[in-house]
Amino acid sequence: MPISSKFNQRVRARLEEDEFEQFSGESTSDEGLEGGESVEDEEEEEENSAEDHSEEDDDEGEEDDDDDGDVEDSSSDINPSLNAISFGALAKAQASLGKRKRPTASTGGISPKRAKVPGRHSPTPSASSSGEKQEPEPELSEYQKHLAANAKKPPQKLTHRTSKHAPTIQSSRHAVSRKRTILEPPPVPKARDPRFDSVVLSHSTNGNSSTASNAAIHARKNYAFLDSYRKDEIAQLRKQVSTLQTKKHKTNYDERELARLKRQITSMSDRQRTFERKEMEREVLVQHRRKERELIREGKKSKPYFLKRGEVKKEAVAKRFTEMSGKEKQRALERRRKKVAGKERKEMPWGRRVVE
């Protein structure tokens, strides 16, 4: 139990074992007398200590080696005997002393805040006694030890994903970005042709879906000559490609121009093929609706059957295949076979892949 050295000096005269047993075993009737005697002894000791303190304040910086040796001997004798003192005796002794006086620098009771200031109330190395022990460093708590251990550890690297389909691994301590998009940028305006725009066509027909679809059909028929223009443009580009390929001495410009023309031909042909496929699907859907109306009109059906998008695509492919010639069918089948074989080869392990 930590007790100041000043408190030890006051109760030093009554810490003999025989006297302490007598003090703890006496009845309550004798406590008043002993309390009075102890109070008188303590008052005398307080006066003596006050005189000693005044003398120490007058002669500041001068300490006797004999007094230090006596204090060390007394503290060594008192410390083992303090373990046998009961809490009741300590409470009575503290109540008899009254208020504690503020410890001076000579008793070693300097507050930790004032002790931190260098050169203020701190004894010089020459004034400090040779036998004085240094205070041990405060022990760290388990939480502080845990923090210190984690601070020394290097950051752990995240393992890679098990496969490309697995989710990305990210630490739970990853800081979320504080940047927020307050105002969205305005969308980039897209080029719209009013002749083929569905919004313009529906507005011109007062929102009627049937008339809007009819208007779109009429617009496609009215501007069907654009398809012929596209075909003519693709034919002209192919002629330019053939002339560049037959050229003997090609420059870097010719090579770049040839690559650009090939890309343009591929893009335009794909776009033309997409238009034809959509037109074929639209025709299939129109024919199916016409058949359903006839069946309902004849009374063979009560509700029409609506084709799904996948069924429309299948019927459009079958119709396009029937309209092809013999050579075109062979080419289409060969392209289909190569496409399926390429997909199967990708799923095949490397050891079984053989170049045909």
From Swiss-Prot:
The keyword Disulfide bond does not apply. Residues 323-333, 341-356 have a biased composition (Basic and acidic residues). GO terms for cellular component: 90S preribosome; nucleolus. One of its GO terms (biological process) is maturation of SSU-rRNA from tricistronic rRNA transcript (SSU-rRNA, 5.8S rRNA, LSU-rRNA). It comes from the Eukaryota. Pfam families: RRP36. Residues 202-216 have a biased composition (Low complexity). Residues 154-164 have a biased composition (Basic residues). Keywords: Coiled coil, Nucleus, Ribonucleoprotein, Ribosome biogenesis, rRNA processing. Residues 230-278 form a coiled coil. Its main location: nucleus. Residues 28-75 have a biased composition (Acidic residues). Residues 1-217, 323-356 are annotated as: Disordered. InterPro entries: RRP36. It is found in: Nucleus, Nucleolus. Associates with 90S and pre-40S pre-ribosomal particles. Component of the 90S pre-ribosome involved in the maturation of rRNAs. Required for early cleavages of the pre-RNAs in the 40S ribosomal subunit maturation pathway. Belongs to the RRP36 family. This is rRNA biogenesis protein RRP36.
